[in-house]
Amino acid sequence: MKRVIVSVINDLVTDQRVNKSCITLQKLGYEVLLVGRKQRKSPPMDQRSYDTKRMKLLFEKGPFFYAEYNIRLFFFLLFHKANLLLSNDLDTALPNYFISKLKCIKMIYDSHEYFTETPELVDRPRVQRVWKRIEGFVVPRLPEMITVCESIAELFHEKYGVKCHVVRNIPARAALPPKGNKKALNLPEDKHLLVLQGSGINIQRGAEELVEAMQYLDDCFLMVIGGGDVLPILKQMVADLHIEDRVHFMPRMPYANMMAYTQLAELGFILDKDTNLNYRFCLPNKLFDFIQAGVPIVASRLVEVGKIIEKYQIGLFIPDHDPKSIAATIKEGLSDTSRRAVWQQGLAKAAEELCWENEQQVLLDIYKHYE
C-alpha cells in the first residue's frame, strides 16, 4: 500500500486543515502517518482514522526549538518509508525537501499562511532573513504548491514563479454538532454571547481592543476559546478592568466542542490589523467556522475576509480599532434586527457553498497529480 508522511510543527490536536488533508489522502488509497510534536501542556490526541506520531522535544520555543524539530524530522523521514511527503508550512519545508531529493520521493508543500510576513518575524528582521532564505531556497525548486487564498497564491507566483493552488480552510458541514443551549454549557442565559476563537490569538489581531471594549458592554459575555501568545495579556486586562463577569477564557478543545460553544454566539470576531501582508491577506479557519455555525461576523477590513463578508452579506466592519468604536459596532450588530435577518440568509447560502464537501474536490485533483 502506498504511504504518505504528513508533517507539521504543532501538536496536531486542533489543526483541522491538516486533519482534512490526511483524510483526503486516505480517500486516494494512501496509508497516512501524521507527524508533529507534543508539548508539556498538549491535550491528549483524539481518535483518528490514520496513524499519528508526536515527538517530545527538549525545547518548546525559540531558535533551538526550530532547529531541534527540523533535525528530528529529517532523521524521522530518513528512516521511515514513504511514497509521498506532505510538508505543512515553512517550518517543516527544509527537511521534507532534502529527503524528497535524497530518496527521490515526491513532495507537496502546503503553506497555511504567508509565513515570512507574520508580525512575529516582521518585528525581528534578522530572524525574518533566515526564514526568507529558507523560503527562497525551497519554493522556487517546487513544481507547484498549495496555499489558503488567492492573494497569497499571487504573491508566491509573482515572487517565485511557482504554480500555486488554493485550498481554503473550510470545515465540513457534517462536522457541525447538534446545537445545544446556554444552560447545558454553563453560559449566562441573560446576556448576548460573543465569541473570539482560534489557536492563534496573537499580537496585532485586535484581541486586546475587543477585551477593552467589553467594559462598555454590560449585557454581553465574551467567550475567548483557544490559545495564543496574547492570552496572558488579555487575562491581566480582564482583571485590571474588573470585567471577569463579562469575559471567560477556555482552553483549546476538540473541534466539535468548540463549535458547540460557537453556535450559541450572536457575533464572532475577526479583528486582525492590517500591519503585515500575512494578516492583510489572511483567510482564517474561524471565518468559515462562523459561517457553518450561522454566526454573523464583526471584522476589520481585510482583503480576503472582506470579499467573503461583502459577497454573502454576513456581517459588518469596525471603522477602526478604538475600543469604543468596537463596542458601538457590537451594539449595532446586536440591535439591528432587519440586518440580522439579511445576515442569516447570507450565512445559510454561504454555508451551503463554502463547505469542505465542495472544497475537497480541489485537493483531490491536486493529490492525483502525485499518484
Task: Describe the role of every protein-language-model region.
Residues 4-7, 146, 188-215, 344, ...:
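Conserved donor-binding/catalytic core segment of Leloir-type glycosyltransferases
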Residues 36, 53, 132-178, 249:
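Donor nucleotide-sugar binding/catalytic pocket of nucleotide-sugar-dependent glycosyltransferases
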Residues 64-68, 116-137, 203:
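Nucleotide-sugar donor phosphate/pyrophosphate-binding loop at the beta->alpha transition
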Residues 143, 246, 262-281, 295:
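Acidic donor-binding loop of glycosyltransferase active sites
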